[in-house]
Amino acid sequence: MTVCVVYITVTHGAKTNDFCARFCSTWNQHPPKADCDLIVACQGGPLPTETALLFASLKPRFWPRINDGGRDLSAYIEAARTIAKGYDMILALGESVHFAREGWLKRLVEARQRHGPGMYGIWGTHVIRAHLLTTAFFITPSLLASYPLPVTDKNSRYELEHGERALWRRLQSRNMPVKLVTWDSEWSPGRWRVPKNCLWRGDQSGVLMKCNHTERYEAADPVRKRNWEASSNRPFR
């Protein structure tokens, strides 16, 4: 199976250097344990040399592009239609993503081998509507490339992630597997809030990766944590 990791960076972003340094250091500390190529999507043009050098140990391919209103999601769709279309799977990762345990890609590959082409998420919630967060997801390129709506602004980004006709719902309607993947299992829609220590529950140790969403929960006081968990655990719809 050929896998491409598409990692988002924002050229000259306020936090980009810090995010990229953490991404690379935690990748090296906690390796994927599965073969992959890394494509760094440079939103807004080529990265400054000092930022690009942070990736030296990972030997990526840099992909400069316009930082349009679709932000990360339009980049992933374009990658699926162009630079990454020849891979079996794409792992789409937002800029704040980082790692705390080795084998994160191996787990996703295992799930893909078990269930087949489809969409595999890292974090699931029922806030607004049930959805897999698009801060990180693992998907067959042709399925992402076939998303029929333009993604050009905040509203269209949210529609893809958690709208009434979200990407995952479109795939499910075609009988494609849509799974939340944790360290010990894969979970179908309706069961994304079942795992212990998932997103916004317990110590979140069941998640394969960390990001800005997991960090905010970690930093919250006990009352806010309870409120976030209760909101995320609302009935599936």
Place the predicted regions along the sequence by residue.
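ER/Golgi luminal nucleotide-sugar-dependent glycosyltransferases, focusing on the catalytic module
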Residues: M1-R237
